[in-house]
Amino acid sequence: MTTGATNERKPEQARPPREEWETRDQVPLLPSRDPFYQPPVGFRALPPGAVLRWRRVDLALFGRIRQHVDAWQLLYRTNSMHHEPEAAVTTVVLPARVRAPAHRPLLAYQCAIDAVADKCFPSYALRYGARAIGAVPQFEWPLIAAAVARGWAVSISDHEGQDGCFVAPREPGYRILDGVRAAMSFEPLGLDQSTPVGIWGYSGGGMASSWAAEMAPAYAPEIGIVGAVLGAPVSDPGQLAVRLNGTAFSGLTAIGIASLRRCYAGLDARINAHIDAEGQQILAAASQLDTVRAGARFAKQDFNNHCDISLAELLTQPEIVEVFDDVRLGQHVPACPMLVIHPQHDQIIDVRDVDAQVQRYLAADGHVSYVRDHCSEHISLMLLSAPLALNWLKNRFRGTGTSNAQNIPVFSIALSAKAIRGYLSILATMLRAVLARPLGPTTARSQHRI
């Protein structure tokens, strides 16, 4: 895929200055109300990844327990799925007051935002004072903290953009990669163009991470991505929406449709033509709720009761089939090695969808190790897979661990001495987080480990 429009200059606009903003220890505003998120005049003239402004921020566990890390937020120039210039925010994190090791790696971690509502964006949900109960990124801090504790720099982008475009194609990858570009140019992080970069995300974050890995060869070939961990990625959002309708997880169907209608005029027209007023109200409400509340409110919701034709028939109309084809993962092969992890008995994302994504990569000579866990389900595997993901990334940062084992079925990834050591390490990190103690390495010796 080409990105010829991405570096276009706008000579009629002056180049905006890079500027630092003061946070003044204030209660964070929602992104839609925070002027920090609004790009300055002339930002379109800058290349993707250019930092427009930055600010120091305090991060917190569930918005309440201030974390002992160094963190900034960067507003940077990026592109939409239609290659229109826009601005996005990434939150970059370092261990507090730890001397930078030689060749510190950068991890691009993607949260499972899984919502349209901006209270679920990690740039808001992870801040001290955020009122974001029910936002999934708050539950992912243990994984982020575990990476910080290793001395890694971490970039956590708002990969859905400022409009909350959940399950939109391609543009999550653009925002993630441009967030990496922004982080690598941000002097306080001590990174440079030779910095090794890893990608990691689970569920909705695994989907966004897949887009970053798929878009990187054409969009950001200069970034040295050494590996990507794709945990339980939403491989086929269209099939997911159909499968979850009327189930305990049908809130995700509502959120997905509410998001995609913003991105595709043809889909929006079909929805307006066939879904009744009550169904429209459900979609409107889903766009305002966090993931947990939407899931609880719309559990068992059956959109067949709100369509003048069956949902299956509605979703086979050409305008909608085209959308579903567009959002399906595996249509571009990543250049980096990948570790895909998925539960065999996932109650949300069908393992067959992920099998198909992996097969599409392998058919195009992609470098994939695929681990299928027979004991876990979707929610538990997020934490249970963390030691495997972290150790695999550690090896990739060191330049090892590139065997191309295509399919690795396991009874449980938790049943190994290495996994147990990993869980104990994460538990110790979380204890430090709860006590607001430093997360990073503290000794001169540990400062040089990856």
Where are these regions (language model features)?
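Short beta-strand/loop motif that positions the catalytic acidic residue
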Residues: 334, 339-346
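Glycine-rich nucleophile elbow surrounding the catalytic serine of serine-hydrolase chemistry
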Residues: 174, 201-214
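Alpha/beta-hydrolase-fold enzymes
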Residues: 211-295
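Alpha/beta-hydrolase active-site loop
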Residues: 139-143, 149, 166-189, 211
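C-terminal catalytic histidine-bearing segment of alpha/beta-hydrolase fold enzymes
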Residues: 312-326, 339, 348, 355-450
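Catalytic-loop region of hydrolases
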Residues: 1-99
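Short, surface-exposed "cap/lid" segments of acyl-processing enzymes
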Residues: 80-147, 158-160
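Gly/Ser-rich "nucleophile elbow"/oxyanion-hole loop immediately N-terminal to the catalytic nucleophile
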Residues: 94-97, 102-103, 181-203, 220-224, ...
